[in-house]
Amino acid sequence: MRQPNRKRKLSLESTERMNQDRCTGQTEEEKKPGEVTTPSKRESSVTTAETWSWEQYLREGNAVAAPVELFSKDQSFPEHENGFQVGMRLEGIDARRPSVFCVLSVAEVCGYRLRLHFDGYLSCYDFWTNAGSPDIHPVGWCQKTKHELHIPRDYRKDKFVWMDYLKACRLQNAPKKLFRNRSSNGPVPREFQVGMKLEAVDRRNPCLMCVATIADIVEDRVRVHFDSLDDSFDYWCDVNSPYIQPVGWCQENGRTLVAPQGYPHPDKFSWTDYLRASQSKAVPAKAFGMRTPHGFLPNMKLEAVDKRNPQLIRVATIADVDDYRVKIHFDGWDHKYDYWVDADSQDIHPIGWCDVTGHPLEVPYGSKHVKILPGQPACPTPGCRGIGHIRGPRYAGHHSAFGCPYSDVNLKREAALQDRLREQTQANLELDPSHSKSENPCNLNVNGKCENANSQCRLVQQAKCLKIKGKEDIDLDNLFRVLVFHPRRLEYSAAQVQQMLHQPLSMTSTSAHPFRDIPLSREQHCKLLPGVADIQASQVARWTVDEVAEFVQSLLGCEEHAKCFKKEQIDGKAFLLLTQADIVKVMRIKLGPALKIYNSILMFRNSQDVTEDASSQEDKR
């Protein structure tokens, strides 16, 4: 595909025309769970009274576009058109689990981008990527390269054969020629070998430099795994990445190296002792390359994927830069939506990329050229036109702040991608990042694996402070005193019941199992909310929208509010993630019923811990 003439007029009008031919996908606000999109023409997201063009926009704002030369081959204009079609099967990396290769299908095609669907799973786990992504491979790649293929749910691993699967389901595999538009820095140096140790930046917590292992090597990239953590923290990078450094780099540069969980005396970590104990070798320092700093400058214009709504690409400005990253600001939007991204990310492109590839471009908010299409769902968030949903691709649109990816109630929530392999629903609580979740650190395995399933704790200190949704610290001791239950008092007036239900149920404590210290508090709430007893979070997570509404209707005094949950299409997983603010401020339910519903949610969230704790105590006896 050719690069556009710099004098050519780049307009939304041509984008819409190309979009009519190349974009396929559903237009309904709600998509059916697990449904794969069939080809259909997708309406442009905007209409224009006049033609919007980059040329005019740059001239009027006296702005400058980021030069095409600053973009890598993966970011710049593709050499070939996107030949993928809806329904084609392929293999690829799970965006949430970088170690897992899965059976994928093309659910939607838009310009040079794909929405990929995990066969056998709900569409809420779908994710977007470019057609030239190094994370996708043709059918049979895993078998050829000896990688394990994570097969569709309900299929037996020893019985799954690609050709039989395609034939039985009358499916088509994506031709190998479609996987050709890739850049490569050449093969990984032979000095890099699987199992070797190094020091690496934790991409989720960039201030941390941690002990890590080379877990896999594919073509020109390596997979970095953090010793003692699960593979959801892994990431792929090339050997020139600034995120990986040789053993001893932290000591030489005065940086703190985070030892693996469970390592004795982490403040006295010794690479010599650790390598000997793990019977491993360090990656030779000479094998590491040095990436040249990018040439991006503040105020340069470009086109960027909206990470809160990944189906959209917006007109953007570089707000700030550091050595290897740029800060993206969407023109016309509040700076609270700005975010940092690697300078070589496939989510940023030169101006005109959308026009050339046939992808819709979201023009700046407040532009006089933008008009809302008739019938488009209304959203109260300024700038949002009802496109996308905080719960990901399962819903094509929203009409309230509850589902809006940009609303204040969702601003601190991670949008779009959900981990389909993590069965246990995570409680909507955040520990202070300077503390761990548990008083018992993960048991260290010298091969870099974590023997404790709860491996998200990053430091070894005991949790003493709890933060809920980024708000003020809670005095746990005072909270527990409020929750003490007097067993002799077996009868309560209606007012007393309401008063007790208005008291929040503690989610955690300084111990790993909170209810060990306050067993009567749970007993109290079970008596006041009998419908909650013996129901675990894993069961609630499987509830449908109707089942959630039915449960809310069963709560005394909450009958009339069941329709709110049905209207917002809240299923079991979404129900478990609700906060008190969501129920009161977004769904506009009065405080009394809201607290009763929220306490039920807290009971559900903690039921699993209580059951496991009881089983553990029984085993010890």
Curated annotation (Swiss-Prot):
CDD domains: MBT_L3MBTL4_rpt2 (cd20136), SAM_Scm-like-3MBT3_4 (cd09582). It comes from Mus musculus. This is Lethal(3)malignant brain tumor-like protein 4. GO terms for biological process: chromatin organization; regulation of DNA-templated transcription. The gene is L3mbtl4. MBT repeats lie at residues 52-152, 160-260, 269-364. Zn(2+) binds at C379, C384, H398, C404. A zinc finger (CCHHC-type) spans 370-414. Residues 1-48 are annotated as: Disordered. GO terms for cellular component: nucleus. The keyword rRNA-binding does not apply. Residues 10-20, 28-44 have a biased composition (Basic and acidic residues). Coiled coil: none annotated. It comes from the Eukaryota. Signal peptide: none annotated. The lineage of its organism: Eukaryota, Metazoa, Chordata, Craniata, Vertebrata. It holds the Pfam family MBT. GO terms for molecular function: zinc ion binding. It is found in: Nucleus. Keywords: Chromatin regulator, Metal-binding, Nucleus, Repeat, Transcription, Transcription regulation, Zinc, Zinc-finger.
